[in-house]
Amino acid sequence: MKKSLKDLTGLIVAFALATLLFLYWPLYQRSVPKANNDTPVDVVLIGGGIMSVTLGTYLQELQPDWKIELFERLNGIAQESSDGWNNAGTGHSAFAELNYTPELQDGTIEIKRAIKIAEQFEISREFWSHQVRHGRLPAPTEFINATPHMSFVWGEDRIEYLRKRHNALIKNPLFYGMQFSTDPAVIQQWAPLLMEGRTQDQKIAATYMPLGTDVNFGVITRDLAKHLQYSQNFALHLDHEVTALRQNPDKTWNVTVKNLNNGQERSIKSRFVFIGAGGAALKLLQLSGIPESKDYAGFPVGGQFLSFENTAITKRHNVKAYGMAESGSPPMSVPHLDARKLDGKSIVLFGPFALYSTKFLKKGSWFDLYSSVNHHNAAGMLSVGKNNIDLVKYLMKQATLTDADRHAELLKYFPNAKPTDWTLVTAGQRVQIIKRDPEKGMILQFGTEIVMDKDHTLATLLGASPGASTSPSIMLDLLAKAFPQQMKNGWETQLKKIIPSYGQHINDSPALTNKIRRMTSETLSLPYLEVPDKSATPPDPTIAPKHQHSPTHNANSEMQAL
């Protein structure tokens, strides 16, 4: 008996020591090579995705004499979440994503988030238009195409919600032209695949926004990166992984990188570092050791879609149709049937289906999640798991899905679909932010967030959606936070040439909305609708008589979707 107790005590002590070692690892900083440049470069960009490349494009125009170096661990640009196959490509503009417009307890629809995202996407259109005019992006149809955005629901409560959402949004210039209908014949004209084979007694409703787009962020990223390399002040290093970040007494940074082709390490000194490495950004932020890094953790979630390439199907679906998550499901489960342009051909994708993975990147390590856990965030991560049990249950359920289960979900949006029509494809990884709140402790936070050190010498972008589609706006925020003096000393004036609406809210003025959209629509070969001075709304298609219902809450309480 005593021997058993002694053995048990020994096991407990060993487990406790192993846990402490795990949470406090590494116990000391390893030695790294000294920087091989006495004069620091101006900026180091980590990660070859759309965020780093967008920031580099801004900086190259604002300060062409600055020396910029970009390090990417893979052998090409935009191979992770920025690649067209690894994201939804929606051009998130809040036209269709119902989780951006929750229903409040009093029955009204909150539209502030939707307006903000719509304005951010207009900034993206301005930025891309500027790059097209200056030859940094190819013909617009290679990366952005007119693709109407739809919201599609069934059931009286959800129809009533969608009606109220439509009424709230169309009072705003950015949403002028959005149509609402409960008429199956009208909805079938908009999206035949949604309606064919559907029972006639099912009550349905949809909104239709002709100004929606499909965006290939991989094309944008690769072409902008190609043009960055035309400058002798820019250097791109592929197959180079950042392994250490150390701040010097003079506030510069030594960035240690490993050449993955020969295994050699070297360090480069930089005045400013941007970590735009997608899912890997959290671990790199932790490598920096800045105090702000202790307030964050991350939870990875992968995504899968059903892919349709048969032209008999793809030629009959030219919209992005977003539904609403089932009651009790997390917002990342919002289903959508999307028309896409990928690899030069039309594709239809349906999903997402969550994929449990401990990787932070699609081409990452299974140990990514575990290596991000430390004594600063371990307890908080456990607390977040306990407080988000619906998400945990959802992921567990998704892990057990069969092809028959996925097809059953598909039939809700494409009633005539056959199992032989589609193949299952794996998209990119996303890492949800877990952040320390001053009052609530660690919480699960949706969206993206810029984390910056107090010296404004290192910045990291954490989070996911809406992400790529609002990258020019996000990087504008970063410029303002990281380089306030340069902004005052001339950058703001230059930015108004790149982003004509800079410093203004597009949605505040029909005249400004028309001016900006007319310009970007012409440059990007996209449809344009003139907003009347008083934002008068166009006549709705046939609408069934309004039913009275008690208020119901939008199933998507958090503002996030894959």
From Swiss-Prot:
Keyword Ribosomal protein: no
Ranges of biased composition (kind: Polar residues): 551-562
Documented EC number(s): 1.1.5.4
InterPro entries in alphabetical order: FAD/NAD-bd_sf, MQO
Keywords (A to Z) from UniProt: FAD, Flavoprotein, Oxidoreductase, Tricarboxylic acid cycle
Pathway note: Carbohydrate metabolism; tricarboxylic acid cycle; oxaloacetate from (S)-malate (quinone route): step 1/1
Catalytic activity: (S)-malate + a quinone = a quinol + oxaloacetate
Keyword Flavoprotein: yes
Any GO BP annotation: tricarboxylic acid cycle
Ranges for region Disordered: 530-562
Cofactors: FAD
One Pfam family matching this protein: Mqo
Gene3D superfamilies reported for this sequence: D-Amino Acid Oxidase, subunit A, domain 2, FAD/NAD(P)-binding domain
GO molecular function, one term: L-malate dehydrogenase (quinone) activity
Family according to the record: Belongs to the MQO family.
PANTHER family reported for this sequence: L-2-HYDROXYGLUTARATE DEHYDROGENASE, MITOCHONDRIAL
UniProt-listed NCBIfam families: mal_quin_oxido (TIGR01320), PRK05257.1-1 (NF003603), PRK05257.1-4 (NF003605), PRK05257.2-1 (NF003606), PRK05257.3-2 (NF003611), PRK13339.1 (NF009875)
Protein name, per record: Probable malate:quinone oxidoreductase
Gene name linked to the record: mqo
